[in-house]
C-alpha cells in the first residue's frame, strides 16, 4: 500500500516528510511525499521557512496522483492559506481511504509555521475533508478558541472541533500536567482514552509527525481506528523513550 505525506521538509530529519516516510516504512507502508515548505532547521531551532510556490505544490500533487494509487494521506505543515487551498482542492476531488491532518501551527522552538489566514481556512473549509485531526493541546486551543486545563476541557474542545466538520478528533494531552500523556478521541458519538506514562527528560522533535503517520499506517493495515491509535500510541511512547541526542538541541527519534 502507498501513503502520501503532504508536509514540510525538515533538513535535520527529525520531523516533516522525512519523519513521516520513515514511520510509514516502519509499518510496511510505502511513502511518497509532496513538499509544502523547506524548513531550514536543526535540533536547536528553525532558522527560516521557505514556502513552496502554490503552483509547484499543485504540480507535485498532480504528479503523485497521476501515477500512484494513494490509499491514505497524512497532512502536516501547510505554511500558508494559498498552499492549503491547493491541497484542499486536490484532495476534495480524489478518492483516498483516509486523510489524517496533524495541524502544524508552530515549531517546537516557537516559530510560526502556518499563517493566521491559513488557520482560518483550515477551520472553515479544510477540516471538512479530514477523517481524523490530531492537534496537541496548544493547537486544539487555537481551533476551539478556549483554554484547556483538564481532561474535561479536552473533551469539550474535541466536540467543538468535531462540529467544524472533521469526522473524528484526537487531542493529544501531553502538554497537560500529570505523569501520564492522555489522548482523547471523539468520533461524534463516544470518547476514547489512550494513556501512556510521560518519559522524563525526553523532549524530541517530530512527535506529532510520527504519531499521526503511525496512526495512518496502522489504519491502512487494519481499517480499525481504535486499534490504529493504540498501536501508534505504544510506538510513539517507545520512540520517545529511545530518542537520541544526535545534535546539540532536542533529541531525535531514531527508529
Curated annotation (Swiss-Prot):
UniProt keyword annotations, A-Z: ATP-binding, Kinase, Nucleotide-binding, Thiamine biosynthesis, Transferase
EC number per UniProt: 2.7.1.49, 2.7.4.7
Single Gene Ontology BP annotation: thiamine biosynthetic process
Disulfide-linked positions: none
Pathway: Cofactor biosynthesis; thiamine diphosphate biosynthesis; 4-amino-2-methyl-5-diphosphomethylpyrimidine from 5-amino-1-(5-phospho-D-ribosyl)imidazole: step 2/3; Cofactor biosynthesis; thiamine diphosphate biosynthesis; 4-amino-2-methyl-5-diphosphomethylpyrimidine from 5-amino-1-(5-phospho-D-ribosyl)imidazole: step 3/3
Short name of one Pfam family: Phos_pyr_kin
Top-level taxon in the UniProt lineage: Bacteria
Binding site for 4-amino-5-hydroxymethyl-2-methylpyrimidine: 41
GO molecular function: ATP binding; hydroxymethylpyrimidine kinase activity; phosphomethylpyrimidine kinase activity
InterPro entries according to UniProt: HMP/HMP-P_kinase_dom, PM/HMP-P_kinase-1, Ribokinase-like
EC primary class: transferase
Reactions accelerated catalytically: 4-amino-5-hydroxymethyl-2-methylpyrimidine + ATP = 4-amino-2-methyl-5-(phosphooxymethyl)pyrimidine + ADP + H(+); 4-amino-2-methyl-5-(phosphooxymethyl)pyrimidine + ATP = 4-amino-2-methyl-5-(diphosphooxymethyl)pyrimidine + ADP
GO cellular component labels: cytosol
Family recorded in the similarity comment: Belongs to the ThiD family.
Record NCBIfam families: HMP-P_kinase
Functional description taken from the UniProt entry: Catalyzes the phosphorylation of hydroxymethylpyrimidine phosphate (HMP-P) to HMP-PP, and of HMP to HMP-P.
Protein name according to UniProt: Hydroxymethylpyrimidine/phosphomethylpyrimidine kinase
Lineage of the organism: Bacteria, Pseudomonadati, Aquificota, Aquificia, Aquificales
Amino acid at each position: 500500500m502507498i501513503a502520501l505525506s503532504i508536509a514540510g521538509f525538515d533538513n535535520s530529519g527529525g520531523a516533516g516528510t522525512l519523519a513521516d516516510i520513515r514511520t510509514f516504512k516502519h509499518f510496511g507502508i510505502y511513502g511518497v511525499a509532496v513538499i509544502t515548505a523547506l524548513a531550514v532547521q536543526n535540533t536547536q531551532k528553525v532558522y527560516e521557512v521557505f514556502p513552496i510556490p502554490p503552483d509547484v505544490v499543485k504540480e507535485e500533487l498532480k504528479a503523485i496522483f497521476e501515477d500512484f494509487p494513494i490509499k491514505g494521506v497524512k497532512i502536516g505543515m501547510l505554511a500558508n492559506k494559498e498552499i492549503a487551498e491547493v491541497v484542499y482542492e486536490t484532495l476534495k476531488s480524489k478518492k483516498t481511504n483516509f486523510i489524517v491532518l496533524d495541524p502544524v501551527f508552530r515549531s517546537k522552538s516557537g516559530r510560526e509555521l502556518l499563517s493566521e489566514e491559513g488557520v482560518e481556512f483550515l477551520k472553515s473549509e479544510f477540516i471538512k475533508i479530514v477523517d481524523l485531526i490530531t492537534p496537541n493541546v496548544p493547537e486544539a486551543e487555537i481551533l476551539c478558541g478556549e483554554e484547556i486545563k483538564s481532561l474535561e476541557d479536552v473533551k469539550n474542545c474535541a466536540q467543538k472541533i468535531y462540529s467544524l466538520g472533521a469526522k473524528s478528533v484526537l487531542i493529544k494531552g501531553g502538554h497537560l500536567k500529570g505523569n501520564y500523556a492522555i489522548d482523547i478521541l471523539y468520533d461524534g458519538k463516544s470518547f476514547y482514552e489512550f494513556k501512556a506514562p510521560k518519559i522524563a527528560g525526553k523532549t524530541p522533535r517530530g512527535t506529532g509527525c510520527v504519531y499521526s503517520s503511525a496512526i495512518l499506517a496502522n489504519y491502512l493495515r487494519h481499517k480499525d481506528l481504535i486499534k490504529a491509535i493504540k498501536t501508534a500510541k505504544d510506538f510513539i511512547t517507545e520512540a520517545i523513550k529511545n530518542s537520541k541526542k544526535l545534535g546539540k538541541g532536542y533529541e531525535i527519534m531514531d527508529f
